Amino acid sequence: MQKLKITGLSLIISGLLMAQRHAAEPVYPDQLRLFSLGQEVCGDKYRPITREEAQSVKSNIVNMMGQWQISGLANGWVIMGPVYNGEIKPGSASNTWCYPVNPVTGEIPTLSALDIPDGDEVDVQWRLVHDSANFIKPTSYLAHYLGYAWVGGNHSQYVGEDMDVTRDGDGWVIRGNNDGGCEGYRCGEKTAIKVSNFAYNLDPDSFKHGDVTQSDRQLVKTVVGWAINDSYTPQSAYDVTLRYDTATNWSKTNTYGLSEKVTTKNKFKWPLVGETELSIEIAANQSWASQNGGSTTTSLSQSVRPTVPARSKIPVKIELYKADISYPYEFKADVSYDLTLSGFLRWGGNAWYTHPDNRPNWNHTFVIGPYKDKASSIRYQWDKRYIPGEVKWWDWNWTIQQNGLSTMQNNLARVLRPVRAGITGDFSAESQFAGNIEIGAPVPLAADGKAPRALSARRGEQGLRLAIPLECRKSSPGLASATSA
């Protein structure tokens, strides 16, 4: 008996440890099913939900129950209907709330970007809002699934068809055609879909270029310094460093006026193309069109440690070059915008979280693009739909129950599909750059060991010094120094 008690205790401890390894998982109300198979009996691939799970989505469960209904949970618990305020307590029932053994989280898929050809701003917007398959129908079905009335024209029986697109200030309005007669309550009050507040953000990783025209490099200057050893023993304990400046002059043109609206979110370096060395940085939070050229100068250095024979000098040389390059370029700009739905909600069912039945006029704006806030983010509301009280806008669980999970996933993926516009132009630059540092052959010193017309510097007592021609010292390229190991 003692052994059995110990074994039972060990199993309990083991079970507790296993439970502690896994954090609580969300329960998505749209996947709950009520089975009338008996106390704590579920269909294939389902299990009874626990008291804790039922408590986390109690309001959702109660809204799906009859007034006097009592339904079972796992481990001898029951949940009671609206008349009982959803009380959860020990008890028994002939039916059971169940949840999939392998639930589907149902994330909204991310589709590949919809690319719009380059053009000015109005061209880009026009192409987007007039695209029936990729824009008008997905946004129309979004309004329809949320419960907006009359999302279609008088000459079609289908959602998103016979739609008119009109310019409205800096934006656009999509609304069902109202010409001719219609039948139905308030059928002349078509739901409007307004698209406005467009913004464009450059994607540096989308860079492409066309045919490259590049000149051969041309020698501009040769900088030579001398490491001089006037002692009677070889010297190699010092680095010889040649300092010089590189420069880039660049310019770009923009094919269309959309570039004036495009901004750069983060600073980035212009991509390298060909063999011409460039160092160009594009500033952040600036209009793309405002950055059409400039010049940059960078101070660099190269070092080498020569072994200088006794009573000798060794030349250390670096050559400065220039080269020209030009080519057409293309970037993509991520397009974001506001999507405002305006109309009255259907009496027969709508997804506003309070589910009003008095056909109220309702305006709501979603932001399609970077996150702004909870109220305007479809993805945030969708992902948090399992938390009662967190999403105080649309009841996405209701839309799933009415239309199906896959239908909602596919439609929202199309609504949230990234949109990109092409930004094209021509780029040209002249770059001044350096080759590699080179060490020449030793040259015996003259009897007096002097280096005419030179700036000399002795380092320590070892007899090693540097000599730099004065004409090189006067210009920014070519300063030299020696440092010990």
Swiss-Prot record:
<comment type="subunit">
    <text>Homodimer in solution; homoheptamer in the host membrane. After binding to GPI-anchored proteins in target membranes and proteolytic removal of the C-terminal propeptide, the protein assembles into a heptameric pre-pore complex. A further conformation change leads to insertion into the host membrane.</text>
</comment>
<dbReference type="Pfam" id="PF01117">
    <property type="entry name" value="Aerolysin"/>
</dbReference>
<keyword id="KW-0843">Virulence</keyword>
<keyword id="KW-1015">Disulfide bond</keyword>
<dbReference type="Pfam" id="PF03440">
    <property type="entry name" value="APT"/>
</dbReference>
<comment type="function">
    <text>Secreted, cytolytic toxin that forms pores in host membranes after proteolytic removal of a C-terminal propeptide, leading to destruction of the membrane permeability barrier and cell death. The pores are formed by transmembrane beta-strands and are approximately 3 nm in diameter.</text>
</comment>
<feature type="signal peptide">
    <location>
        <begin position="1"/>
        <end position="23"/>
    </location>
</feature>
<protein>
    <recommendedName>
        <fullName>Aerolysin-5</fullName>
    </recommendedName>
</protein>
<dbReference type="InterPro" id="IPR016187">
    <property type="entry name" value="CTDL_fold"/>
</dbReference>
<feature type="region of interest" description="Interaction with host N-linked glycan">
    <location>
        <begin position="68"/>
        <end position="84"/>
    </location>
</feature>
<dbReference type="GO" id="GO:0090729">
    <property type="term" value="F:toxin activity"/>
</dbReference>
<feature type="region of interest" description="Part of the transmembrane beta-barrel after proteolytic activation of the toxin and insertion into the host membrane">
    <location>
        <begin position="256"/>
        <end position="288"/>
    </location>
</feature>
<dbReference type="GO" id="GO:0005576">
    <property type="term" value="C:extracellular region"/>
</dbReference>
<dbReference type="GO" id="GO:0020002">
    <property type="term" value="C:host cell plasma membrane"/>
</dbReference>
<keyword id="KW-0800">Toxin</keyword>
<feature type="site" description="Important for heptamerization">
    <location>
        <position position="390"/>
    </location>
</feature>
<dbReference type="GO" id="GO:0031640">
    <property type="term" value="P:killing of cells of another organism"/>
</dbReference>
<keyword id="KW-0204">Cytolysis</keyword>
<comment type="similarity">
    <text>Belongs to the aerolysin family.</text>
</comment>
<keyword id="KW-1043">Host membrane</keyword>
<keyword id="KW-1032">Host cell membrane</keyword>
<dbReference type="InterPro" id="IPR005138">
    <property type="entry name" value="APT_dom"/>
</dbReference>
<feature type="disulfide bond">
    <location>
        <begin position="42"/>
        <end position="98"/>
    </location>
</feature>
<keyword id="KW-0732">Signal</keyword>
<dbReference type="InterPro" id="IPR037015">
    <property type="entry name" value="APT_N_sf"/>
</dbReference>
<dbReference type="InterPro" id="IPR005831">
    <property type="entry name" value="Aerolysin/haemolysin_CS"/>
</dbReference>
<keyword id="KW-0964">Secreted</keyword>
<feature type="site" description="Important for heptamerization">
    <location>
        <position position="374"/>
    </location>
</feature>
<feature type="propeptide">
    <location>
        <begin position="446"/>
        <end position="485"/>
    </location>
</feature>
<keyword id="KW-0354">Hemolysis</keyword>
<dbReference type="InterPro" id="IPR055267">
    <property type="entry name" value="Aerolysin-like_C"/>
</dbReference>
<feature type="disulfide bond">
    <location>
        <begin position="182"/>
        <end position="187"/>
    </location>
</feature>
<feature type="site" description="Important for oligomerization">
    <location>
        <position position="155"/>
    </location>
</feature>
<dbReference type="GO" id="GO:0016020">
    <property type="term" value="C:membrane"/>
</dbReference>
<keyword id="KW-0472">Membrane</keyword>
<feature type="region of interest" description="Interaction with glycans from host GPI-anchor">
    <location>
        <begin position="346"/>
        <end position="355"/>
    </location>
</feature>
<dbReference type="InterPro" id="IPR005830">
    <property type="entry name" value="Aerolysn"/>
</dbReference>
